[in-house]
Amino acid sequence: MKTAITIAGTDSSGGAGIQADIKTMITNGVYAMSAITALTAQNTTGVTSILNATPEFLGQELDSIFTDIYLDCLLYT
């Protein structure tokens, strides 16, 4: 099975961001992983709030994946 990681923010409504990327990957038979750059409070009408991940935390997320799992694809949005 092919593997991929999405590096993006969340979308609490599920229509974009990591949630949408993971749905797309799974639909296409890809093992999906993620590194979260920001948490958002949003719905279909707009974004209420954004909490950005620190560069250090993002680095820890990526190190955790890269030291354990071979990646076939990286999606950065």
Region locations from a protein language model:
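Conserved small/polar residues in nucleotide/adenosyl-binding loops
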Residues: 76-77
